[in-house]
């Protein structure tokens, strides 16, 4: 524990919060190109085949991002928009692909939470 004299001379060191999405470098989203689209399995209590993509961002950094929703049309060389946001049961996945932007199509037949999945208003409910 510092003495009062030491605190007068140097003060307390300020705690600096680390970014949870450092590859975006302060931007809300970044465009990128898919270099690999694959499935992976989640951590221990859960079981599934989660769809993820390795994306080279426009700032030349490579990140692993999650493809949300049921079904997708992404493949290698697809242009995608990447936002922050981790997937709790996939270690190393700290980003999400924005559905309905660039080459990533929206989720078909989606009725609820449509804005999160880039789905248009269904014709029948108009």
Swiss-Prot record:
3-methylthioaspartic acid found at: 89
GO terms of biological process kind: translation
Segments for region (Disordered): 106-126
Single GO cellular component term: small ribosomal subunit
SUPFAM superfamilies: Nucleic acid-binding proteins
Domain of life, source organism: Bacteria
Keyword line: Methylation, Ribonucleoprotein, Ribosomal protein, RNA-binding, rRNA-binding, tRNA-binding
GO MF annotation, one: tRNA binding
Family in the record: Belongs to the universal ribosomal protein uS12 family.
Quaternary organization: Part of the 30S ribosomal subunit. Contacts proteins S8 and S17. May interact with IF1 in the 30S initiation complex.
Role according to the record: With S4 and S5 plays an important role in translational accuracy. Interacts with and stabilizes bases of the 16S rRNA that are involved in tRNA selection in the A site and with the mRNA backbone. Located at the interface of the 30S and 50S subunits, it traverses the body of the 30S subunit contacting proteins on the other side and probably holding the rRNA structure together. The combined cluster of proteins S8, S12 and S17 appears to hold together the shoulder and platform of the 30S subunit.
PANTHER family: 30S RIBOSOMAL PROTEIN S12 FAMILY MEMBER
Protein name from the UniProt record: Small ribosomal subunit protein uS12
Lineage of source species: Bacteria, Pseudomonadati, Pseudomonadota, Betaproteobacteria, Candidatus Tremblaya
């Amino acid at each position: 524990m510092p003495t009062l004299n030491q605190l007068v001379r140097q003060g307390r060191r300020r705690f600096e919060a680390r970014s949870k999405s450092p590859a975006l470098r302060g931007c809300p989203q970044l465009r990128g190109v898919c270099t690999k689209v694959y499935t992976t399995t989640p951590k221990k209590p859960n079981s599934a085949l989660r769809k993820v993509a390795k994306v080279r961002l426009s700032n030349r950094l490579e990140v692993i991002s999650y493809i949300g929703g049921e079904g997708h049309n992404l493949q290698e060389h697809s242009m995608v928009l990447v936002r922050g946001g981790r997937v709790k049961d996939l270690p190393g996945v700290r980003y999400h692909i924005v559905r309905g932007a660039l080459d990533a199509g929206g989720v078909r037949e989606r009725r609820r939470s449509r804005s999160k999945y880039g789905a248009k208003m269904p014709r029948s409910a108009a």
